[in-house]
């Protein structure tokens, strides 16, 4: 009988080294999600002339340790502010977190390591960051609410951290459900009192018309 030799490898081990060839910037942001990066890019481009320079990168391109080292040497170590949002938390980008934490402390960089899941708390990310806990919570709040207005406010807050005199706005709550009314914008759809539990499980919707409701023939769509 022959015993087969087996080996295991993580995604980081299987990834190929990549040199992103980015140039340095005052503000740097990394994320696993395209929606984060596209939202930040749009917000920065809308007011680029008055904002500090910014670089964005996808964490999926920085999975190999050599890729991380190259990027830190060419970009991160020259930044004033670095924001990283990690889907899956510390364990999904352990090497990058550790290296950035060391460089940030060595060079006095403001580092925010945030969880990708907005309601989760990862103490290892908090400990690796150089910003106060209150500032980390505030930065995460923009992602938690989402939307163009909050991405714009987030970019301005990062600019302020980088030394700009840009005015800072707190995260704005975005309705979890609603509909778009031409000429008025997004109209929230109140959820309180609209459903009630039934015996044996499930819920029963309150079908009574409310003043803010649209006629039944018009379709209500969730706010994205």
Task: Tell what function each PLM region has.
Residues 1-194, 205-207, 215-224:
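An N-terminal assembly and electron-transfer interface module characteristic of large anaerobic redox
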